[in-house]
């Protein structure tokens, strides 16, 4: 009996030893090389090890069972992988780590027109991928930009909900918007074209805040937004994304990739948006949100050529029908004075492409063209506009020793015509230009960039825009950059300022408007902090300064019934500091935090005034956490804005002269437990904020939008408040106690209340 027990004990020990003898080993790599000192842990146990100089690791004496292995290394994303040990055979398992610089090492092209890693570029470029925009799904690029620090979509009309993009407090026309590096969205389409760009076409968005005129021309005064569309070669075979909201907005994105022979790959994208619900929660008998139906079709082709030379061409067509106004409005009232409505039909076509010439030297021919037709009625005011823009550019890219040269010639043709009295005949403008840029490597840690552009405007003559940039890399984790340049901008009021179109105020242009000129500079600092447990913190801070001469300002205050445009008799300044902080934890928690402090002012005759609709402070955030065991991702996003100065119509106007502090916050949950599918749902505007709060009304005189009952003073009229009303101004009467006219310009944010949304994505790769 004792012998039997002894044999059983020896057998058990032998079996236990066999179990403990199993090992897991392999190599840890990243960015094409083996990683030394990476931490490898067997979760749920005390076993851990560190890779050697060859990136090799080995975990010994692992028993049979199911485990999770976690691998962490400074500068790389933490990876966790399931592994099962079914028998006593040793297991070989390699790991490939991804860079964890939170897109600091993304390849960008917007800063210098060359593909370069963000950290190696002398020009600061911010990059936002589709992952960022999926945190708060929207139907257009315009809405998607609301969670980017220092970038604010600004609504310009409380009825038709048109808007533009402000960068660091500068109005939309100071921002150049590109698609694949081509100037597609500009002038007339800054007002209506932005809402027609579907998110489904976007690979990433690059943003340059500050001077970029030496490469992109005079319009890039305040910065640029470059929308990089998807590469057909890397796109999924088929994708679909549909979401709807409790407001009954519906958005559908479809994408399909197909090959034509062995030489061509094509990506076809379709976007359809529809919102046809008349909602009036603020009870002013006007629509809270513009009704809209929009379809956009996009087709991009990549062609394979010898020596990997580039040839890509893309086209997009868009049609939109939008209206807002009196809740009783129908199409039969369009342009009439019975029921007020603002109705805009937009048709737009675009063509862009790049072709690398078949020479040993790197010569790239880029081209773009667009046509934009707009047929609008703002009550009885008719605005019918037609714009055509063509652009052609040839660049030469050459490295000579320490010099990385880029030279180019470009020509831009603009045609514009409308039916307003301010446009007596169609305007045609040629803008040929030549530019050269030299990026000089002074040492492994420092480089300098010198650039100069010369354009000749067929109306305003010669335009010089120099540029200077310096980059110093103290070490792998600390980088300083300084940029400076000038800008020059020709203003077209009726294509840039929606308030000039509506007819709710008379437009007065006091003198021949001179082109605006600017000088600007910014200082950029990047600090990366890596922790041994895999946590990463990235800090990027930028101080910026822009001074304008000949700045054109819109005066809403001198006469409440007019918008008076004139060059400022002085100067204007936009300055501030902006900080972004990215934090990645190995647990799956990720934070993106940003804040910007602004000081914008117009200085005229020694008097400094803050412009309308310009905040002093803004902050954004995105907090994401993924629960791996549930395949569930949570995204909490939001922004906050400080008060802005708002235009009032009279001294008796009861609306607040400033907006309050306000915040728009959203939450989303995404489930990805099914192959190729994602389900997402959430709530937008959690705090239920609308501009109507704390105001008696937003749009003035909605009961009399054609001003039929407004009394204009002859200079002797006495209002109900006992004061003589100056000639030409509105008399305060019992029917109009505040002395107002119909006006839609008192707007600074979206008028949608809290709402839910639900969506489904399908991706076939």
Predicted regions and their residues:
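Gram-negative outer-membrane beta-barrel transporters
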Residues: 441-445, 538-539, 543-547, 567-648, ...
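Membrane-embedded beta-barrel scaffold of Gram-negative outer-membrane proteins
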Residues: 263, 364-376, 473, 481, ...
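Flexible loop and strand-edge segments within Gram-negative outer membrane beta-barrel domains
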Residues: 275-296, 304-363, 369-388
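Short acidic/polar hinge/loop motifs at secondary-structure boundaries
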Residues: 60-61, 166, 182-209, 297, ...
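N-terminal periplasmic accessory domains that precede
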Residues: 91-95, 141-144, 161-166, 193-198, ...
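C-terminal beta-signal and adjacent terminal beta-strands/loops
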Residues: 640-647, 671-765
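Extracytoplasmic beta-strand/coil segments of soluble accessory domains associated
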Residues: 142-183, 203
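Short, acidic, small-residue-rich periplasmic hinge/interaction motif at the N-terminus
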Residues: 27-33, 37-43, 72-76, 86, ...
